[in-house]
A protein has these predicted regions:
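Oxyanion-binding and handling regions
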Residues: 1-20, 32-36, 91-219
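Short amphipathic alpha-helical face segments that pack within enzyme cores
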Residues: 38-41, 77, 99
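DPxDG-like acidic metal-binding loop motif
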Residues: 59-90
Length: 219
């Protein structure tokens, strides 16, 4: 059975294809806002290269952020379209932060965090906990932190390890306190998004991670 993961990251989108327990590929393409129109072509080209088509994939996992609202919604909408009217095809949304923090390989019971550039000299924090079998699950704790709040927040968590994307490292470290233990990674562990067990395949792709409340405007 084919399974697939689509996870939008700050400077790229990752596509992972598996067949049963075999990882066939982990492909990444630089992609930001205006490049999002390339996503369907990227997915189709990768599937074709491995002798598959969207209809062959029976389990879809979508990275749900945090990230660009436009990118998250596009990935969810595209996946929902490929699943529409197919009772044997299941999908789910799993926070991409799980894949990023999973790069730290937290031990069972260990708390860790993924941190993102929140712009405006702030970082977005997403907490996770290590589980048996190299699994990771969210703790439910999220925060928007400027330098002052970050100093107090991480001061209460001495030694907690943090993961960040390399493309955001400069901006993130400018906000983190000097004692924070952060590691940067070019990519996240998207295979973990497929194999994590905390989130069932419920066909609900409408739960993007909004750590910072969405801003609405009116005319």
């Amino acid at each position: 059975m084919y399974r697939a993961v689509i996870d939008p990251a700050p400077d790229h989108t990752a596509f992972t294809l598996l067949r049963d327990d075999e990882v066939l590929c982990v492909e990444r393409r630089p992609m930001r806002g205006r490049d999002a129109a390339e996503l369907p072509v990227f997915i189709l080209e990768t599937l074709t290269a491995h002798g598959a088509a969207p209809g062959d994939v029976k389990r879809w996992t979508v990275g749900s952020g945090p990230g660009s609202f436009t990118g998250l919604r596009l990935v969810a909408a595209l996946t929902a379209a490929w699943c529409l009217g197919k009772p044997d095809v299941l999908s789910r949304a799993v926070p991409g932060a799980v894949a990023l923090a999973g790069m730290l390989r937290p031990a069972p019971g260990e708390k860790a965090g993924a941190v993102y550039d929140g712009r405006n000299k702030e970082v977005l924090y997403f907490g996770v906990e290590g589980m048996p079998g190299n699994d990771v699950r969210p703790t439910g704790e999220t925060a928007v932190l400027d330098r002052e709040r970050a100093a107090a927040f991480f001061g209460d968590r001495p030694g907690e390890r943090l993961a960040m994307f390399s493309c955001e490292e400069t901006a993130v470290r400018a906000v983190l306190p000097p004692g924070a233990t952060g590691e940067s990674f070019a990519y996240s562990d998207t295979v973990l998004l497929d194999r994590t067990s905390f989130q069932p395949f419920d066909n609900d792709l409408t739960r993007p991670v909004y750590i910072r409340p969405a801003v609405y405007t009116s005319n």
